[in-house]
Design a protein with these regions (language model features):
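Short, well-ordered coil/turn elements that cap or connect secondary structure elements
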Residues: 85-87, 125, 146-148, 175, ...
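Catalytic core of membrane glycerolipid acyltransferases/transacylases, capturing the structured
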Residues: 55-77, 85, 100-159
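Membrane-anchoring hydrophobic helices of lipid-metabolizing enzymes
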Residues: 1-104
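Generic preference for hydrophobic
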Residues: 92, 106, 130, 237-239
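Short acidic-hydrophobic, aromatic-tinged amphipathic segments that line or gate anion-handling sites
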Residues: 92-93, 152-155, 245
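Non-catalytic C-terminal accessory region of glycerolipid acyltransferases
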Residues: 6-9, 163-281
Length: 281
């Protein structure tokens, strides 16, 4: 379903157009109302898309982003409100347990490139930033908006560069700039099953001393095929647990990774879990 404000505003403009065209006094002109409604709705969507494209030219990705852009956050949330309901129906559980005060590290399995959109839709008030592979910065529009939302880019082939990204995440949390979302598997695997974790990512929570929000996603891997068929995908997002700092105090990152892996694996079921090693340092 499209956002209410978009539907209502289109209805108001269509009613005004119908009134000016005399549709309410002449029944033969009632066709003006639905045509005006659809036309105005499309014009708003096209105009908004054009604005997003034009504004992206003002974004300099070479300039360090020291804080979250409220304006870009607002635009991103509007895009998510507009696009996500058109392509997926989200069935979410546990959203009431998301921390309301303070920052957190959110971890989840990773199935498709649009996984972040699910969390933006489910937790619009949580001010999320996403750890992403550096190649995504080159994506049309998305790369520039990621920069404004302080999304740390990680080089998965260079351990030293990856460490810098981890330290950046820790600083974002400590400075209370945003909550961080990371996918511990590091990759989207072809079989779409849960694979081993890169346990170093849990250093982010340990060093920043923040809760770890454990989530799972299901069915986002079908989005691409269903979009082509103009079919909505039923996506399942489950918040399994919120692990407080005192609960993981004294644990190594491997132990913590194994605990979270087990939690996700049990929820997803054996058919969605790889049989390989659980976590790697």
């Amino acid at each position: 379903m499209l956002p209410i404000y978009l539907l209502v505003s289109s209805g108001i403009f269509a009613a005004v157009t119908g009134l000016l065209a005399g549709s309410f006094s002449d029944l033969s002109r009632l066709w003006v109302l639905p045509v005006s409604y659809i036309g105005i709705l499309l014009l708003q969507i096209i105009g908004f898309s054009l604005f997003l494209w034009l504004w992206s030219f003002t974004i300099d990705t070479e300039k360090p982003q020291e804080k979250d852009s409220k304006f870009c956050r607002f635009l991103t949330n509007r895009v998510v409100e507009l696009v996500v309901p058109l392509i997926m129906k989200i069935h979410a559980t546990g959203t009431e347990n998301i921390p309301k005060d303070g920052r957190f590290l959110l971890v989840s399995n990773h199935l498709f490139d649009l996984d972040p959109a699910v969390f933006l839709r489910c937790f619009p008030k949580s001010q999320l930033t996403f750890v992403s592979k550096r190649e995504n910065q080159k994506m049309f529009l998305i790369g520039k908006y990621m920069h404004k939302l302080m999304c740390p880019l990680i080089n998965r082939e260079n351990d030293r560069e990856a460490l810098k990204s981890i330290l950046r995440c820790i600083q974002i949390l400590k400075d209370d700039l945003a909550s961080v979302v990371i996918f511990p598997e590091g990759y989207i695997h072809k079989d779409r099953k849960l694979h081993h974790f890169r346990s170093g990512v849990f250093k982010i929570a340990q060093r920043a001393n923040v809760p770890i929000v454990v989530c799972t996603l299901q069915n986002t891997q079908y989005l691409k095929a269903n979009i082509r068929r103009l079919k909505r995908t039923h996506v399942y997002m489950d918040l399994l647990d919120v692990i407080q700092p005192e609960q993981y105090q004294g644990m190594t990152t491997v132990e913590l990774g194994n605990q979270i892996y087990e939690m996700m694996a049990q929820h997803l079921g054996p058919e969605n879990v790889s049989t390989e090693e659980r976590t790697i340092p």
